[in-house]
């Protein structure tokens, strides 16, 4: 594969994202013996990224590095209970990284003009889910939940009072 390799991902005849030379990587950690795989998808100028589950950070994820692992960090940390390796783009598509391992994302930062994601393992499976119609973000989210499963509606009693020790009043 040469330096001119390009993969264009299109929907309705229009390019929504893509991958170029050096968009796929393999990294071996000599200290731990672990292998990590990474992929990068292009971002257009002005394209915003949303999602990645529960975060105590700005809603727009551009410029953020997000490491996904479960942890009890409270509200003063970036650790969260509900990590979801799925993001939506303002261009009307979503990306789901299908990995049971800890997944790291770097979203359009000073170092990356793309969304880069990586995980430990010998393979890295991800889905680019194009939205369609009048509301492509809603459609992409619906297609994502069709792929991964939709939750049942919790019982009415579960919507009651919620107490926390993280805040004082």
Where is each model-derived feature located?
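Structural preference for beta-strand elements that scaffold enzyme active sites
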Residues: 156-160
């Amino acid at each position: 594969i040469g330096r001119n390799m390009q993969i264009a991902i299109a929907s309705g005849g229009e390019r929504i994202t893509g991958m170029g030379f050096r968009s796929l990587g393999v990294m071996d950690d000599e200290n731990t013996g672990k292998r990590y795989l990474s992929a990068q998808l292009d971002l257009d100028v002005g394209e915003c990224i949303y999602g990645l589950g529960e975060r105590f950070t700005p809603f727009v994820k551009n410029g953020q590095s997000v490491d996904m692992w479960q942890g009890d960090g409270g509200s003063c940390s970036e650790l969260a209970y509900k990590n979801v390796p799925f993001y939506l783009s303002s261009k009307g598509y979503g990306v789901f990284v299908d990995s049971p391992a800890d997944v790291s994302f770097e979203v359009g930062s000073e170092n990356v003009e793309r969304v880069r994601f990586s995980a430990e393992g010998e393979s890295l499976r991800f889905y680019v889910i194009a939205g369609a119609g009048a509301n492509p973000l809603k459609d992409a989210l619906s297609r994502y939940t069709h792929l991964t499963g939709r939750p049942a509606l919790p019982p009415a009693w579960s919507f009651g009072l919620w107490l926390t020790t993280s805040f004082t009043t």
